[in-house]
């Protein structure tokens, strides 16, 4: 439509660099997806055409104890009528096919090392050399040197605390009112014999009272279930282990009845930006660069949503880039319309209404629940003001008695080693270390 309204840009090259070997390999989510961005991006398609597994028809929310599960009314922010259960990996593969069909160049297997800059302008990226040994020397026929790729505009869509996004924010001194805080999610996909007829969310056990988080169980099909546990990284117990608690959780009757006798076929883990409205960078554009999706912090925790925000932000970025290229100007001022568009969109509207929802739980589960209820009823007006927070690493940790470790049985519960095998990780043992500790 922009092409129709504003005329064609002529021949331009658009490239997508994906660090995974194939599209979708490094994407992980629950996921229950709001389809609004699909409808906006592909208005000519019907819901049946989109890469979504099934609509949400039933849902339940439980407060858990070690042996019981008490169903509660679904909180307003967690109601998913009109949303769809999906695999984010399948979505990414489908989107990649659509992009290639439009002539966009998609390059899987190309992780990026750094930004290319001239003065304050981002002019492209440098890829990571491939096929290096432990000492950083070429090893084998698959070795490939770094490549410099230049672009009029570079869009950073690299997820939670992406290294290029963080480097650009630090370099340009772009801040947010609160620091970003994060959660860690661990997920398994199971082939099961007993079908699940609804999406399930839980809170409380197995988490301690001063940890924020909860679990999910989604039916991807009648024979496939996604189950996971997500926990804020500001938990106070220094020995807390999210993977271990997911294994413990699966022993609970609520989960065991569906998983027992089935097979765990996939495992994965990822971090999630949870800070919300006050943790979004004040500026998400610069000279030759735009940040979208999780890299910009567009996640609304109380509704467990971020995928459609990422897509909407990508659409807004594309529109502003189109205008900038038409004018032949990709400066910071020329791309400022992107940040303005997001700030005036449903993304920031939703984040603002629930701006303190996650932050309210800094004081614990019970007090946070009371505050969250008030916020839901008043659309964020009460309690008023900003709740200030520190980075997760600044929270004091305690070292009490270590929690009992679940002894994996290899059928319902699994060690981390066995779980990582199910992730499909095939990294060579002699690659350069990617974890570097500063002095």
Describe these PLM feature segments.
Residues 3-67, 164, 172, 345, ...:
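N-terminal FAD cofactor-binding segment of flavoenzymes
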Residues 50-56, 61-65, 347-439:
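Ferredoxin-type iron-sulfur electron-transfer modules and their immediate structural context
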Residues 269-297, 301, 426-439:
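FAD-binding beta-loop-beta segment adjacent to the flavin cofactor pocket
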């Amino acid at each position: 439509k922009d092409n129709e309204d504003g005329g064609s840009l002529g021949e331009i090259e658009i490239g997508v660099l994906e660090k995974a070997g194939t599209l979708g390999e490094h994407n992980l989510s629950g996921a229950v997806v709001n389809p609004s961005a699909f409808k906006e991006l592909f208005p000519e398609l019907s819901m049946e055409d989109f890469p979504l597994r099934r609509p949400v028809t039933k849902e339940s929310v439980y407060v858990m104890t070690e042996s019981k599960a008490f169903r509660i009314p679904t909180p307003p922010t967690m109601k998913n009528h009109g949303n769809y259960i999906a695999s984010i990996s399948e979505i990414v593969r489908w989107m990649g096919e659509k992009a290639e069909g439009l002539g966009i160049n998609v390059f899987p297997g190309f992780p990026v090392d750094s930004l290319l800059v001239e003065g304050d302008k981002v002019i492209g990226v440098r890829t990571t050399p491939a096929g290096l040994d432990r000492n950083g020397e070429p090893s084998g026929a698959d070795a490939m040197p770094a490549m410099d790729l230049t672009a009029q505009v570079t869009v950073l869509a690299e997820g939670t605390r992406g290294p290029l996004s963080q480097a650009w924010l630090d370099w340009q001194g772009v801040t947010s009112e609160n620091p970003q805080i994060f959660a860690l999610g661990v997920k398994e996909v199971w082939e099961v014999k007993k079908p699940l007829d609804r999406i399930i969310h839980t809170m409380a056990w197995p988490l301690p009272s001063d940890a924020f988080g909860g679990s999910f169980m989604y039916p991807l099909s009648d024979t496939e279930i996604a189950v996971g546990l997500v926990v804020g990284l500001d938990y106070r117990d220094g020995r807390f282990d999210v993977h271990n608690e997911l294994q413990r959780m699966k022993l609970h009757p609520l989960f065991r009845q569906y998983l027992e006798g089935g097979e765990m076929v996939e495992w994965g883990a990822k971090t999630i930006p949870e800070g919300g409205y006050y943790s979004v960078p004040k500026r998400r554009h610069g000279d030759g660069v735009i940040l979208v999706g999780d890299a910009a912090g567009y996640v609304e925790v109380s509704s467990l949503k971020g995928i459609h925000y990422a897509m909407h932000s990508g659409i807004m970025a594309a529109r502003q880039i189109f205008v900038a290229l038409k004018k032949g100007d990709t400066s910071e001022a020329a791309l400022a319309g992107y940040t303005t568009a997001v700030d005036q969109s449903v993304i920031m509207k939703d984040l603002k209404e629930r701006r303190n929802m996650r932050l309210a739980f800094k004081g614990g589960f019970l007090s946070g629940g009371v505050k969250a209820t008030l916020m839901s009823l008043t659309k964020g007006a009460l309690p008023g003001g900003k709740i200030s927070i520190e980075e997760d690493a600044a929270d004091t940790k305690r070292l009490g008695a270590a929690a009992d470790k679940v002894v994996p049985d290899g059928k319902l519960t699994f060690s981390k080693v066995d779980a990582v095998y199910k992730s499909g990780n095939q990294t060579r043992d002699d690659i350069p270390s990617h974890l570097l500790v500063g002095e």
